[in-house]
Amino acid sequence: MEAQKLSAQEIIQFIGNAEKKTGVKVTLSGMPSFKSAGFLAENGRPNFKALANKGIQVLGDFHTHYSLKIIIGDWQAVRPLLEGLTENKDYTIEFEGRNSAVPLLDTRAINARIEPGAIIRDQVTIGDNAVIMMGAIINIGAEIGEGTMIDMGAVLGGRATVGKNSHIGAGAVLAGVIEPASAEPVRVGDNVLVGANAVVIEGVQVGSGSVVAAGAIVTQDVPENVVVAGVPARIIKEIDEKTAQKTALEDALRNL
């Protein structure tokens, strides 16, 4: 299998050096007036340019009572703005994490199908025509090959790697490992089917063409072209024509 694009030490440095942020979304009603220095334009409304320079996004019409106003940014920057309210202090705050080091992945340039509700952190690699279903959780450093499907509620831990044209079933877990940095991540080869709710333990490699049965717990490496099942998982047979037909992928699901 190919070497990973990011080593554990590189990920550790990325997290350690990252600016920690506490994202908030503030919804205001009425016509709020601010007194905070540097935040005001001459009309007493927000100075949008100054706010943007502080990483704050402001949405809504501040010239009317009748629309909601939304402020989005880091709590450290937004808090002084709220403390400067002089009237109409009617607002709610939604917090997103606390001192988070890893943002979500910007998926705009990814040539894959990613359904709403998938949680994908930054520094994740996703191949062309992959499919990420709702509820999937993919941690930093994970790699997903082209044409691979990560089904509903599946979890790929840090640095977990899945090859091309594989299927990770609903609720399955590929255990992640970022620390200790010397530990090996899970590596799943090409054309592999991991059944629903199966668990592959840290450091295990699953060879290309193999099948992991639903509910199996895989604690040892799996060779190519075999079926494993049970707790702990054991080889129950080699892949035959019947098994290959039953586990074949559907290309239409990967069309964009």
From Swiss-Prot:
SUPFAM superfamilies: Trimeric LpxA-like enzymes
PROSITE patterns found in the cross-reference section: HEXAPEP_TRANSFERASES
Annotated pathway: Amino-acid biosynthesis; L-lysine biosynthesis via DAP pathway; LL-2,6-diaminopimelate from (S)-tetrahydrodipicolinate (acetylase route): step 1/3
UniProt keywords, alphabetically: Acyltransferase, Amino-acid biosynthesis, Diaminopimelate biosynthesis, Lysine biosynthesis, Repeat, Transferase
Stored InterPro entries: DapH (IPR019873), DapH_N (IPR013710), Hexapep (IPR001451), Hexapep_transf_CS (IPR018357), Trans_hexapeptide_repeat (IPR050179), Trimer_LpxA-like_sf (IPR011004)
Claim: Transferase is one of the keywords in the record: yes
Record-level Gene Ontology MF annotations: tetrahydrodipicolinate N-acetyltransferase activity
UniProt GO BP: diaminopimelate biosynthetic process; lysine biosynthetic process via diaminopimelate
Catalytic activity: (S)-2,3,4,5-tetrahydrodipicolinate + acetyl-CoA + H2O = L-2-acetamido-6-oxoheptanedioate + CoA
Pfam families named in the record: DapH_N (PF08503), Hexapep (PF00132), Hexapep_2 (PF14602)
EC number: 2.3.1.89
Keyword Ion transport: no
CDD domains linked: LbH_THP_succinylT
Protein family per UniProt: Belongs to the transferase hexapeptide repeat family. DapH subfamily.
Record's function text: Catalyzes the transfer of an acetyl group from acetyl-CoA to tetrahydrodipicolinate.
PANTHER family: 2,3,4,5-TETRAHYDROPYRIDINE-2,6-DICARBOXYLATE N-ACETYLTRANSFERASE (PTHR43300:SF10), ACETYLTRANSFERASE (PTHR43300)
Name this protein carries in UniProt: 2,3,4,5-tetrahydropyridine-2,6-dicarboxylate N-acetyltransferase
The species this protein was found in: Lactococcus lactis subsp. cremoris (strain MG1363)
